[in-house]
Design a protein with these regions (language model features):
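Repeated loop/turn-to-beta-strand initiation elements of outer-membrane beta-barrel proteins
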Residues: 60-63, 98-102, 131-138
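Solvent-exposed loop/turn segments connecting transmembrane beta-strands
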Residues: 38-48, 74-84, 111-120, 148-156
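Transmembrane beta-strands of outer-membrane beta-barrel pores
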Residues: 39-43, 67-73, 95, 108-114, ...
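Predominantly the C-terminal beta-signal and adjacent terminal strand-loop region
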Residues: 22-24, 70, 120-167
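Transmembrane beta-barrel domains of outer membrane proteins
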Residues: 40, 52-54, 92-94, 126-130, ...
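Short glycine/proline- and aromatic-enriched beta-strand/turn motifs that initiate or cap beta-hairpins
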Residues: 19-57
């Protein structure tokens, strides 16, 4: 009888540990602080690295804020790229509490250039898939140019591909 109880207790412990390992893969449904880092590119030759930090409500909803660094190489009138700093609010909703989950997200904020007066408003809705701790998304990005070097072009429209890691 003692062997049976010891074996049962050992199996219950192992199953509990296995269940904990499996649920750690579902980062979108864990309540508390969450962060991510992402690399992205757009069709207009912008290359970015961003990080977002915020709160996950435990039901698939994440709200946070982020900052990044962007190199913009499409402006033909100069040989050197422009370096920009995006600052944004970030909202994301993951639909499933599974290892693979589709999501929708939106980033709204500003893009700031310290070299020139070329500050822009940023709107970036995105759809994608989270696979465990990794995320891949495809989105539309609108950058409205307030004032600066790009004359006769009030806004820029991009398709942005993003690959990220969720902590």
């Amino acid at each position: 009888m003692k062997k049976f109880i010891a074996t049962f207790a050992l199996m219950a412990t192992v199953m509990g540990m296995q269940a904990q390992n499996e649920t750690k893969d579902f980062v979108n449904y864990e309540r508390g602080y969450r962060a991510d880092i992402a690399l992205s590119t757009s069709i207009s030759e912008q290359y970015s690295i961003t990080t977002s930090h915020g709160y996950s409500f435990g039901n698939g909803l994440y709200v946070g804020g982020g900052v990044g660094f962007t190199a913009e190489t499409f402006l033909n009138f100069e040989d050197e790229p422009h370096y920009l700093v995006p600052l944004f609010a970030d909202v994301k909703y993951s639909f499933l509490n599974k290892r693979v989950s589709p999501f929708v997200s939106a980033r709204v904020g500003g893009i700031f250039n310290t070299e020139y007066q070329m500050n822009r408003m940023l709107i970036n809705p995105m759809v994608g898939i989270d696979v465990r701790h990794f995320s891949i998304g495809l989105g539309y990005e609108l950058q409205h140019n307030f004032k600066g070097l790009i004359e006769n072009k009030a806004s820029m429209h991009n398709v942005r591909l993003s690959v990220g890691y969720i902590f």
